[in-house]
Amino acid sequence: MSNKWTLPQNQGRSGGDLSHISTALSQGRQKMKRVCLDCTEEFEAVVLGPATANYCLKCGQKRQRFQEETKRIAKEQLEINRYREIVARAKIPPKWKETNFDNSKPGLSPGAFKMAKLYAETFSVQSPSLVFYSPENGTGKTHLAACIANHVLHVKRVPILFKKARDLMLDIRRTFSDGGDLTEADILNRVLSAQLLVLDDVGVDPTSQWLQATYWTVFDRRVEWQLPVVVTTNKPIEAHVGEVCLADRIGDGALSRLLGLCQGNVIDMSGLDLR
């Protein structure tokens, strides 16, 4: 004969009396009179264990709004400081600082303008590189490169570096002298840290073994880190009889690296003169 056991009606299935828990909870929610530390008005506060409100509902909400606003202002200030820093590091020359697609010169090649504007508006670090070419001066190559630089910098707020190719080479040469503050690695790291590098007048100087090696290093760094570059040049990509081409100035290796970055994006602006 089997015995059947049943729980007492006043006992929970866990085998214990839970009334002490509800009692503790009710005690934990006791209310007491407090004086608000802000407005000094008396209010009824809920006691939650050792924690008790020090501010009335109105002042507490006011303090919360103040804290949220303080965080928002601090975040905005950080963004402003970052923006100022990347603008200073961009090194856009004064002549080109105000250049943009809205104030561009009349007479620019419509096709080149359209491609440059589309490139700037859709720019990302995954964008291919871009070359503006014309054998003549004054066709708007640097103008469009500056439009791209300013849009990417000020609208997209992406770090860029704008340099004359000759100035970049001179900066690197200066590191060879004793007592310089910067090393060659410092200069190249600046070139690499910019998410967009704009190099103006590439190939303008007569070539040398050092010059070709330096161009190769610059473009190779951009390839390795998959970062785009916008180049202007008055030297053709393909050589013709008796003509100095870009490879003659920067070397076959550097040109190969540049063309790999460009993926065929070479804008020919030959025949224009906006001056």
Q: Model segments located where?
A:
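Loop/turn-to-beta-strand initiation segments
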Residues: 128, 158-159, 193-196, 225-231
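A short, basic N-terminal segment
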Residues: 1-111, 266, 275
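Short glycine-rich substrate-engagement loop in P-loop NTPases that contacts/grips substrate
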Residues: 107-114, 135, 139, 149-193, ...
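Pre-Walker A (pre-P-loop) alpha-helix and adjacent loop at the N terminus of AAA/AAA+ ATPase modules
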Residues: 90, 103-131
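Walker A/P-loop nucleotide-binding motif
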Residues: 126-146
